[in-house]
Amino acid sequence: MAPRPLLLLLLLLGGSAARPAPPRARRHSDGTFTSELSRLREGARLQRLLQGLVGKRSEQDAENSMAWTRLSAGLLCPSGSNMPILQAWMPLDGTWSPWLPPGPMVSEPAGAAAEGTLRPR
């Protein structure tokens, strides 16, 4: 009688060890996790890229602001030697922009701009 339970035990244990486990079916939660992870990784990569660009931009902004300050100081207070430089900035057709109203521009002398204005008595 002892061989019968032993045989039954061997059949149960041997049968389960002989068959490989069926492959696990892909679940919706696996895809959700994978897509969420990919999205988070992409967001982190873009954030690092933007931080790198902003860091570079802030360094460039400091350099550019200094250059514009120097340039604007020369444009706002032109000396006689800078006048050809100012005229070089004027477009060839004499119009600055189609959106700006016609009138005196930077390259025109101040006397022409002052003509026709009323002076207080």
From Swiss-Prot:
Annotated positions of the Valine amide modification: V54
GO molecular function, one term: digestive hormone activity
Phosphoserine sites (modified residues): S58
Compartments where located: Secreted
Induction details: Serum secretin levels are increased after single-meal ingestion.
Short name of any one Pfam family annotated for the protein: Hormone_2
Positions of the propeptide removed during maturation: 19-26, 58-121
Domain of life the protein comes from: Eukaryota
SMART domains: GLUCA (SM00070)
Primary subcellular site in the record, as a coarse category: secreted
Entry's Gene Ontology cellular component terms: extracellular region; extracellular space
Residues making up the signal peptide according to the UniProt record: 1-18
Keywords linked to the UniProt accession: Amidation, Cleavage on pair of basic residues, Hormone, Phosphoprotein, Secreted, Signal
GO BP, one annotated term: hippocampus development
Family: Belongs to the glucagon family.
Function: Hormone involved in different processes, such as regulation of the pH of the duodenal content, food intake and water homeostasis. Exerts its biological effects by binding to secretin receptor (SCTR), a G-protein coupled receptor expressed in the basolateral domain of several cells. Acts as a key gastrointestinal hormone by regulating the pH of the duodenal content.
This protein's name: Secretin
Encoding gene per record: SCT
